[in-house]
Amino acid sequence: MTEAVDILIIGAGPVGMTLHLALAAGGQKSLLVDRRPQQAQQGDPRALALSHGARELLEQINSWPTRAATPIETIHVSQKGGFGRTLIDRNDYQLPALGYVVRYRDLAGALAANLADDAVLSEAEILDITPGDDHVTVSLRHAGELRSIQTRLLVHADGTPGDDPDVSVSDYAQHAVICEVTPTPGHNKRAWERFTRDGPLALLPLGDEYSVVFTLPPAKADAVLAMD
């Protein structure tokens, strides 16, 4: 038997959950499908940088993690070997902050708290995606059962193409080295972005620390990770 939903969202991470809740606020029904257990995101410590506009959207769906978010009030941008720098200040744009840094788990938790019990099919394996003239049919395995779901709109929001041959992948030959450091003195809510030939280096204020994201070619990233 084939089930029918208006919108099917593959991926129940922050992007998928935000879309689901925004659609619900507008009176649209959708279903989330995710290959991971629903609690898998609760331990993810990665830092996410969000714009002020993202905060406004999350506030509209009652999912802004106020206490967990660190505001970015200034951003210092420069290029290695280049002259000068750009300094962006929230006051120039009459904003409370240019953006915010929040841990993945805190944002995911705030969003998940607003989901209905039947909003997500967790630990689901996508078996096949078949497009039709005015719909898409998704075959999957969930809780040991085979299910067929027909939808008018299919959204990929899981960050990976999975086994879908219709999703193209571009290899940029870059890896991100991520760590956290404690600055002395404190970061004063300033973010830094430095462009280099190998890739950008970003320092994002998170609590009392900086979350460091250094984008490098794979071989150089491995060399950095091998350092003591």
Spans of features found by a protein language model:
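Beta1/beta-strand and adjacent pyrophosphate-binding region of the FAD-binding site
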Residues: T2-G13
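Conserved N-terminal helical subregion
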Residues: E3, T70-A176
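Hydrophobic anchor at the start of a short beta-strand
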Residues: I7, Q28-S30, L154
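Glycine-rich, N-terminal phosphate-binding loop of Rossmann-like dinucleotide-binding domains
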Residues: A12, Q38, D158-G159
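N-terminal Rossmann-fold NAD(P) dinucleotide-binding loop
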Residues: G16-M17
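Glycine-rich FAD pyrophosphate-binding loop
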Residues: A22-R46
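N-terminal FAD cofactor-binding segment of flavoenzymes
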Residues: D44-K80
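Conserved FAD-binding catalytic core of PHBH/FMO-like flavoproteins
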Residues: R147-S148, L153-D228
